[in-house]
Amino acid sequence: MISQEEVPQSTNHSLSFSSLPHEIVVSCLARVSGSYYPKLCLVSKQFRSIILSNEIYKARSHLGTKENRLFVWLKLPTRSYPSWFALWIKPNETLTNDGPIKKQSTGNLLVPLPCSYNYQVLVPSVIVGSETYIVGGYDDALSSSVWFYKNGKIHTLSKSPSMSVARIDAVVVGQYPNIYVMGGCDSDESMNWGEVFNIKTQTWEPLPDPGPEVRGQLVRKMKMQKKNVYVSSEKKDYIYDTEERTWKVTEAVFNFSWCVIEKVRYIYYNKNCWWLDTKSKDWRKIKGLDFLNKFRETDRIEIVNLDGKLVMIWDRFTLSKRNKKIWCAMIALEKCQGCEGIWGKIEWIGDVLMVPLSYSFLDCMVISI
């Protein structure tokens, strides 16, 4: 028989994350949805440091817990360089009312990202063939570098010859064997504001000077069709003819936004959202979205595919007209029963960030991190 004196006495210990090994804390945080990260950053300096590091993304990739996130690229008058913002969505956010849609305070926000996010996730890149080329970065030591992944494998990261000038937030587009890089440097760089990299010869060549008007504006987007590079800046759109090596102003070539969801192509154009009927080759209007008109004051609207749902982003004036607010709506798409139409069902709508009147909306994208 065991006496009472021999019975081990349990002791209550107060355990905390700070007492755990660092790698265990990283592993735990990597398993948590990114929707909770804004509040977790407020828990402790340790949590904030891990969440804002590249370490957490390596762990999420290893554990298979990566999520699709929406990033927005803005130019604010108070900052020297454009800034990336991430859309933080409250977990299980959805409208519960079945009545008329009204403006609601969703709690969803566009949160500015520190440079550590920018460098690790959002550096300019382009896919050419089986290789992904990463151009520049947010570190002075890397801002003139070009790296590439062979066959999509990170462990085969290699370095190509450096650009003529360092670039931060450059815009790139590629069509084998060339990669075109523009902007991201001082506007006085007339000789090297734009460069082209030849993959075959592994050499850089400067592009003709487009002039101070082009160099003085931020490049929002670029796309390439056949021999032409289409460049969209803050105020105008331009065409660079790669064969003639000439620049010219063109009509707006980015006057609509598009995305693909479950093999269906969607565009926002002429104040409406449309989908392409591949059988008839006709563009058809998405039904059920007329209510959005009262929330919009601009023709400039971006749409993206976020986990199979249509996300719309735009801006509008505040009541005082002294600022603007960026708005966002998440829409679930449903095919009509017994017909060939598509309905849009709002899940939430609200303003996510206040910005100065003089800001510029540059771009948005969805990235798996």
Curated annotation (Swiss-Prot):
Kelch repeat residues: 131-177, 178-224, 228-274
Keyword Transmembrane: no
Organism expressing this protein natively: Arabidopsis thaliana
Signal sequence bounds: none
Identification of the protein by name: Putative F-box/kelch-repeat protein At4g39760
Lineage of the species this protein comes from: Eukaryota, Viridiplantae, Streptophyta, Embryophyta, Tracheophyta
Pfam family, any one: F-box
Record-linked SUPFAM superfamilies: F-box domain, Kelch motif
PROSITE patterns documented for this protein: FBOX
UniProt domain F-box: residue ranges: 14-60
Alphabetic keyword roster: Kelch repeat, Repeat
InterPro entries: F-box-like_dom_sf, F-box/kelch-repeat_ARATH, F-box_dom, Kelch-typ_b-propeller
